[in-house]
Amino acid sequence: MAIKAEEISALLRSQIENYESEMSVTDVGTVLQIGDGIALIHGLNDCMAGELVEFSNGVLGLAQNLEESNVGVVILGPYTEITEGDEVRRTGRIMEVPVGEELIGRVVNPLGQPIDGQGPINTTKTRPVEQKATGVMARKSVDEPLQTGIKAIDALVPIGRGQRELIIGDRQTGKTTIGIDTILNQKGLDTICIYVAIGQKDSTVRANVEKLRQAGALDYTIVVSASASEPSPLLYIAPYSGVTMGEEFMFNGKHVLIVYDDLTKQAAAYRELSLLLRRPPGREAYPGDVFYLHSRLLERAAKLNDDLGGGSITALPIIETQAGDISAYVPTNVISITDGQIFLQSDLFFSGVRPAINAGQSVSRVGGSAQIKAMKKVAGTLRLDLASYRELESFAQFGSDLDEFTARKLERGKRTVEVLKQDQNKPLPVENQVLIIYALTKGYLDDIPVEDITRFEDELNSWTKSNGSDLLNEIRETGGLPSDDKFEATINEFKKSFSKSE
């Protein structure tokens, strides 16, 4: 068979014409220095701030410091296998986490990877971790209540959907308990909850997850955990990952509650990173942008206007103080960013007043407009009564001969303190709260011994399930306060069957 030269040349020509050379240019650098979760990279000249870079062992890092010839990178994972001279590549991507309904009921790390041993999360949707907060015109003022189920909060420092309410206090004063109880109270209220555990012991996180699971709250909750054993970059990222997951639901018209437990540890992790990156330290050795660290996080909590679906993110950041000092750097920063604070006091906690809320220093700047009418009416004078009781109590210690008015006020004050006490993990529906606070403020508890108040309330709640359900239903469905006659009939009917202790 003869081979023609023309055929060969035509074949070669067509091959050459169809040849496509795909050149891929990758920006590659080398590790100059590595340690404590920080790497100094040389050669990534076009790297962007906040860009993800990939080390040769597959671990990702986040570009933070862009210097003249080097890039400071925080490593998002184990860094012990990375050595000097290793290759580092740009990815051209910014950090994103998986979002969506598939995350509900799962425990994930700040990168969105499951750590609960229940298999992979089947979602392809992701959102950037660093996102600009919702603009002014996209928001609307807080007008819907978010019930915590805690009498002292719903009556004295009410929280609305879209609000940022700080929970602040020393260690071991019940801060986490308030966050967990609020999550438990959202059962059946069509709210997605996100619990972000930052720098806590693994055993503590496990105990809290079990609490949520036993109460059936894990069915509407996502847990994001960056425990104390994780590298500090993950502790720094964790709150942003949590709020990113929440934004997906908010922009779809849903209501979200997010608890950051706690932001003091996030600030400490960020201080550690900044000092290792050789950024200049400021007050208490924190970097200059520690205010922005928290403001850009908490500003992402919002109530969207109706055109955007009316969704909301309500944030409950937790801050731990040292010896009750709320004038330290991070506490004052976060107090100035949030819409109010719940101040928990060690003295109250150890004297048996739990939740240990200091009514004088706790405030809600926007929640009052979201309180239901019934609660607003019955709890109107409660804060004042409590403040005057605390004042009289300190005077009464010095003298025994008190006039009748003062003695009566002291007795009412003791009962007020008892009514506002509440066991942990037992949130109370708002209609039951209105009933007991009405009974207190209208004097129905004045003839009940102080030691019987808790038992009186428990038995009243049990009794009304079968006998006073009409009254409770009216409060629940209308939000208004039923007539005094209805309250009087219900409370007096119950008091007939209540036996006081001798």
From Swiss-Prot:
It catalyses: ATP + H2O + 4 H(+)(in) = ADP + phosphate + 5 H(+)(out). PROSITE patterns: ATPASE_ALPHA_BETA. Keywords: ATP synthesis, ATP-binding, Cell membrane, CF(1), Hydrogen ion transport, Ion transport, Membrane, Nucleotide-binding, Translocase, Transport. The record marks 362 as: Required for activity. Residues 115-134 are annotated as: Disordered. Its EC number is 7.1.2.2. One of its GO terms (molecular function) is ADP binding. The keyword Nucleotide-binding applies. Pfam families: ATP-synt_ab, ATP-synt_ab_C, ATP-synt_ab_N. It is found in: Cell membrane. ATP binds at residues 169-176. It is a peripheral membrane protein. Belongs to the ATPase alpha/beta chains family. F-type ATPases have 2 components, CF(1) - the catalytic core - and CF(0) - the membrane proton channel. CF(1) has five subunits: alpha(3), beta(3), gamma(1), delta(1), epsilon(1). CF(0) has three main subunits: a(1), b(2) and c(9-12). The alpha and beta chains form an alternating ring which encloses part of the gamma chain. CF(1) is attached to CF(0) by a central stalk formed by the gamma and epsilon chains, while a peripheral stalk is formed by the delta and b chains. PANTHER family: ATP SYNTHASE SUBUNIT ALPHA, MITOCHONDRIAL. Produces ATP from ADP in the presence of a proton gradient across the membrane. The alpha chain is a regulatory subunit. This is ATP synthase subunit alpha. It comes from Staphylococcus haemolyticus (strain JCSC1435). The gene is atpA.
